Amino acid sequence: MASAQNEHDERAGALRVERAIVELRRGRTIDVMDSHGVAVVAAIERLDPDEVSDFVAADGSLSLVLTPERGEALGLVRYPSALEIALPGDTSLESILRLATGMTSIGEEHVEPLRVGQADPRAAAALTLARHAQIIPAFVTRDPAEGRADLLLLQVSIDDIENYPLIRGRELQRVSRARVPLAASENCEFIVYRERFGDAEHVAIVIDTPDSAKPVPV
């Protein structure tokens, strides 16, 4: 019974991640949650300039979350995971995009960070989502209004995000197969699989008739 419940929970989590990926690709804000709180995040790649002001905190700062590699390229201290840069609240979206995509540096952009530090785990998890969504791994983030999650935003947990790669690689559906003679062997078959969770496709090339009792060469 517990095993069936665990499987149900894992699938439900994978669906939440899938929906979060769609939201990010469409430029919508989401909530990333864990037992300690909520981070409201928006991918800068799809962010509307008018929405930037929604992420300016009460102290006038705008928090940008980047990968450690990008931070190092900007000349900042390398952190073990994501870093969070508090920028002046009037920083333009154009400047944010240039900082996040390697087209400039902190000095060249004439932006003086108010604070630089390691991002909290929720904001860091958003970068993992960006990789799954195949978008620029950079987000603006803020605390939720009134300290609680906005029920109008899609909510996904850190556990959902961490478990997603295990689930998406575990369930593959065969969608097509065809015989395709090759120069090395006329007895060859291409089999295409699609992930049940995720949008990646995998191709298996079967040459001749492998002995399933022996290790299959890859």
Predicted segments, located by residue:
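Catalytic domains of riboflavin
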Residues: 1-218
